């Protein structure tokens, strides 16, 4: 059951009984700015778990257009605001944006923003993937990022938060250091995997 898996991965540790967390420069608060920059397939492959575009007939131009607006307009407005305030972001990026919107990742790279993998497409869910299918999907993202950026992906956030019970193990096995699918705490905490801890 989920409760057993959760207890095995992230044992309960009330925030009131933990040692005080010390941030750099004795800051009282840490703010992590992580915009999701996603790409939704216009006519995505059929999915086992749910239809990415429930409105029929396909293509669902209305819902696709709302999401595509973010990559054409919204992201640039957000970058302007972050630049104005001197804020460096970590981008939760669907790797398909490297192909479809190269200007986006070029803008992120020019600002030395960290790129956190958000899967390939936000309409390519991992729910119901076999272990091998999910391992291959993670490797594909690592390979795309490595080829274009020359670095290893530091973190993982499954597309549409479509993680499986295997995801933490597969992410750690692939050499990724932190994992963002679980919203289970207010502080970064270790998550147990078969390949060492993730944060």
Task: Describe the role of every protein-language-model region.
Residues 2-155, 160-199:
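Catalytic alpha-helical scaffold of carbohydrate-active enzymes acting on polysaccharides/glycoconjugates
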């Amino acid at each position: 059951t989920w409760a057993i898996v959760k207890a095995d991965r992230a044992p309960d540790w009330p925030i009131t009984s933990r040692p005080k967390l010390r941030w750099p420069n004795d800051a009282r608060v840490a703010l992590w700015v992580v915009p999701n920059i996603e790409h939704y397939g216009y006519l995505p492959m059929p999915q086992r778990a749910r239809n990415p575009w429930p409105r029929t007939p396909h293509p669902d131009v209305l819902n696709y257009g709302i999401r595509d607006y973010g990559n054409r307009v919204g992201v640039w407005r957000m970058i302007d605001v972050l630049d104005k305030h001197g804020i460096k972001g970590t981008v939760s990026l669907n790797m398909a944006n490297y192909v479809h919107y190269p200007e986006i990742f070029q803008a992120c790279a020019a600002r030395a923003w960290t790129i956190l993998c958000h899967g390939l497409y936000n309409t390519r869910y991992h729910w119901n993937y076999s272990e091998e299918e999910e391992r291959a999907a993670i490797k594909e993202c690592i390979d795309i990022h490595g080829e274009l950026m020359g670095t290893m992906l530091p973190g993982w956030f499954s597309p549409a938060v479509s993680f499986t019970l295997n995801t933490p193990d597969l992410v750690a096995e692939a050499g990724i250091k932190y994992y963002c699918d679980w919203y289970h705490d207010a502080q970064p905490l270790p998550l147990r995997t078969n390949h060492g801890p993730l944060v």
